[in-house]
Amino acid sequence: MLIKQGERLINARNWSELVKPDQILREEETASGTHGKFVCEPLERGYGTTIGNAMRRVLLASLQGAAFVSVKIIGVQHEFTTIHGVLEDITDVILNIKQVRLRMDTEEPQRLTLRVERKGPVTAADIVANQHVEVLNPDLHIATLTEDVVLEMELEVRMGKGYVPADMHEGLADEIGLIKLDSSFSPVRKVAYTVEQARVGQMTNYDRLLLEVWTDGSLTPEDAIAYSAKIIKDQISVFINFDERVSGDMRNGSGESGEVNEHLFKSIDDLELSVRATNCLRSANIGLVGELVQRTEAEMLKTKNFGRKSLDEIKGVLLGMGLDFGMKVDSFDKKYQEWKRKQQNEA
């Protein structure tokens, strides 16, 4: 499985022969809009900890979310004071405000208001949202009015990531009465992972990663792990110093000279694949390599009894022939018949 790129020889076995998970499964028994437990197996020994730790760090620190960045309470000049008719002092009110969880569908800062004139509890449901912002925990207690007084405030919401101290927010005016807030933007509240043994055939020296994610409801656990995986992929791809894809002129089944790659006309029986992989291809009515390479990886994984291990096995063989899945082979049937006639004439 050696691929020549210019003067370099790339050994694709370094990655093509590693065990990879067939898919990520979610345990439905405990699933909800804010909690998910995911199973990823099989993995090479040690990869469970490597992937689990990286995913946990990114999940907790790097995902975008919405949070309040400032509040202006009418009649209050600073946070170290009280309001007549309000049971809590301003510090406690602010702590409660920072617990409000939000979903926002725009990157532009939004201003929300709250105005209550009745005696009794004030909750997040009293915040007047707009078409871009949704309050996810409306039952959250904010304050208690002990008299028929007016509690009025203006709040600014922004998108961000991680934890941002109050003095680190950009563009907030330094005006009297505007209280800047420490903001926790992360939509992920908690992450835990464990690594267990996994079996592949008779071998048990593989990893099984259990990843558990809790969110605030503004992002589903599935999307949270998908975004985190994308972040990691984008960050580490810069280390790859070769073209891991088949070159562009090979994508249509032609070699550098423009000649049709004759490997396309091989029977799958000549590829020396495992019995399982060969049987899966036959059940999918694939008899020639040229028919195989026109299928995408996603299409192949939908084939009955066809898993990631078979996919990786076949992909490695194809790469060794300068081919890959998802190739465009124009008029393959016609080219195949022409090739057969040519072989017969030469015989």
Curated annotation (Swiss-Prot):
Q: What is known of its domains?
A: The N-terminal domain is essential for RNAP assembly and basal transcription, whereas the C-terminal domain is involved in interaction with transcriptional regulators and with upstream promoter elements.
Protein EC: 2.7.7.6
Task: List the InterPro entries hit by this protein, alphabetically.
Answer: DNA-dir_RNA_pol_insert (IPR011262), DNA-dir_RNA_pol_RpoA/D/Rpb3 (IPR011263), DNA-dir_RpoA (IPR011773), RBP11-like (IPR036603), RNAP_asu_C (IPR011260), RNApol_insert_sf (IPR036643)
Question: What's the stated role of this polypeptide?
Answer: DNA-dependent RNA polymerase catalyzes the transcription of DNA into RNA using the four ribonucleoside triphosphates as substrates.
Which Pfam families would you find in this protein's record? RNA_pol_A_bac (PF01000), RNA_pol_A_CTD (PF03118), RNA_pol_L (PF01193)
GO CC list: cytoplasm; DNA-directed RNA polymerase complex
Task: Report what the protein is called.
Answer: DNA-directed RNA polymerase subunit alpha
Tell me, what is one Gene Ontology molecular-function annotation carried by this entry? protein dimerization activity
Residues of the region (Alpha C-terminal domain (alpha-CTD)) are: 260-347
Class of this enzyme = transferase
Q: Which organism is it from?
A: Desulfovibrio desulfuricans (strain ATCC 27774 / DSM 6949 / MB)
